[in-house]
Amino acid sequence: MPHSVEAEQGVVEAFLEYYAPNSDGSLPDANDLEVQYGRKNLDLKSVKVGDMRSRDFKLEEDGFTLMKHESAMTDFTDREKVKKEYYPEVAEAIKKHTGASKVICFNHNVRSTALPGLDLQKQKVDHVGPMRRVHIDVAPGGVSEAVTKRAGEEFMSKFQGRWKIMNAWKPIRTVERDPLGVAVAASVPDEDLINLKRYRPDGSLSESRYAVKAGEGHQWYYVPQQRTDEMILFTQYSDNPNRGIADRVAHCAFILPGTEDKPVRESVEVRALVVF
């Protein structure tokens, strides 16, 4: 019998921002930031979101897990300091939890505004707020090339088929609004995923990520009042040719009813190459 979120304690009902295809079935212009951050191609759906603390979620089965990590850092405004001091912390925490042989943290986002700041004329994001569109950061197509640029050809040759991309997400202060929600990987079938590709002006591929359509049976979870010592670790991609469904986790921020006047969420997320 399939697991039911509704049967658990601490369930909330919230609207999630899913992707809506064009009426003719064609894909939208993925370079248009309103497709990712604005109101274009938006399908707002009411869903049940369970309490992640209610179960022992596992990376290998569910695609995500909740782990303890008390950081020595409290100020994340200096990007170079984050790279120098926080990256090693996160890498060690991931290695300890997963048994990975090598972890390379390669970028991060600090989110401390209520909404992303869009400059639609320049087609850029001026500041980063909670990402409310349901998505998966990485989709097949251009991933190996991007990783090669960051980690080098020697890494790709040595660890081919053995690495994953994971996100490590934690609050900078206790979350009171716009929490992160993640979906049990197996509850989101491949047919609900749309590979959206962004291209540079010269026509080369810039980014490939999954948008997510609403579907029956998606199982969503979040951490109520998530504390600074609680880190959500979730998988976005696997280089293993026999990759499983738990290797891509849909996620998004969502509006928690009744919290709109609470302090703005502050969080830090690190993306890492994890070698097994």
Curated annotation (Swiss-Prot):
Signal peptide segment: none
GO molecular function: oxidoreductase activity
Pathway terms, separated by semicolons: Secondary metabolite biosynthesis
Application in biotechnology: Phomoidrides A and B (also known as CP-225,917 and CP-263,114) are potent inhibitors of Ras farnesyltransferase and squalene synthase. CP-225,917 and CP-263,114 inhibit Ras farnesyl transferase from rat brain with IC(50) values of 6 uM and 20 uoM, respectively. CP-225,917 inhibits squalene synthase with an IC(50) value of 43 uM and CP-263,114 with an IC(50) of 160 uM.
Enzyme Commission number: 1.-.-.-
InterPro entries per record: AsaB-like (IPR044053)
Enzyme kind, highest EC tier: oxidoreductase
Keywords assigned by UniProt, alphabetized: Oxidoreductase
Catalyzed chemical reaction(s): 2-[(1R,8S,14R,15R)-11-hydroxy-14,15-bis[(6E)-oct-6-en-1-yl]-3,5,9-trioxo-4,10-dioxatetracyclo[9.4.0.0(2,6).0(8,12)]pentadeca-2(6),12-dien-8-yl]acetate + 3 2-oxoglutarate + 3 O2 = phomoidride A + 3 succinate + 3 CO2 + H2O
Record PANTHER family: BLL6449 PROTEIN, OXIDOREDUCTASE AN1597
NCBIfam families noted in UniProt: CmcJ_NvfI_EfuI
Protein family: Belongs to the asaB hydroxylase/desaturase family.
Function: Alpha-ketoglutarate-dependent dioxygenase; part of the gene cluster that mediates the biosynthesis of the antihypercholesterolemic agents phomoidrides which are dimeric anhydrides. Within the pathway, phiK is responsible for the iterative oxidation necessary to convert prephomoidride to phomoidride A. The pathway begins with the highly reducing polyketide synthase phiA that catalyzes the formation of a C12-fatty acyl-ACP, starting from one acetate and 5 malonate units. The hydrolase phiM is involved in the release of the C12-fatty acyl chain from phiA.
Protein name: Alpha-ketoglutarate-dependent dioxygenase phiK
Record organism: Fungal sp. (strain ATCC 74256)
